[in-house]
């Protein structure tokens, strides 16, 4: 049984993502937060979804799920894995590592996609923190912007708190 099959059994939402990917050949919930630069997405479940992502212009991926994507899927792109449990938030060091990864990739004209399982909680947290550091938004404004562009984003109080703490950490 492969990694994604194990995750499908352990997390029912992953069954939907796997079926969606087989039919649509693209991950769930993909959208650009910053046009052609920074995107959020649900978890890719096949190499054909990775191919679709690359065709959108993405050149770097951050995975926010407990398990990384298979190495064979990401061997030709810049990749960062920040293991974070569902509905929780990464710590300040992990957030800053992800935000700096995004900024460094964008400086090299390498569009970035951040994903978790559904592409809303952990993904939204990192996207909001990027907006705080590099778009100079307040925590509240960053959360509002991410939620406007990606409805349902930032799912838990701990994620909202982490975004607020990151803002304070920087200021």
List each language-model region with its residue ranges:
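Short cysteine clusters
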Residues: 116
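Conserved G/P- and acidic residue-centered "switch" motifs that form tight phosphate/ATP-binding loops
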Residues: 119
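Ser/Thr-glycine-rich phosphate-binding loops at phosphate-binding pockets of nucleotides
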Residues: 123
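Cys-dependent protein tyrosine phosphatase-like superfamily
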Residues: 1-112, 128-171
């Amino acid at each position: 049984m492969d990694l994604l099959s194990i995750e499908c059994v352990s997390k029912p939402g992953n069954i939907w993502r796997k079926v969606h990917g087989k039919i649509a050949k693209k991950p769930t919930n993909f959208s650009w937060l910053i046009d052609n630069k920074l995107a959020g997405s649900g978890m890719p479940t096949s190499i054909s979804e990775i191919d679709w992502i690359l065709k959108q212009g993405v050149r770097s991926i951050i995975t926010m799920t407990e398990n990384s994507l298979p190495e064979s899927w990401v061997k030709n792109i810049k990749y960062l894995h920040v293991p974070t449990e569902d509905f929780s938030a990464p710590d300040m060091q992990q957030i800053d590592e992800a935000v700096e990864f995004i900024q460094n990739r964008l400086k090299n004209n390498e569009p970035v996609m951040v994903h978790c399982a559904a592409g809303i909680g952990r993904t939204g947290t990192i996207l909001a923190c990027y907006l705080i550091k590099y778009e100079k938004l307040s925590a509240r404004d960053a959360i509002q912007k991410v939620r406007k562009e990606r409805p349902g984003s930032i799912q838990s109080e701990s994620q909202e708190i982490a975004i607020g703490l990151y803002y304070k950490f920087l200021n």
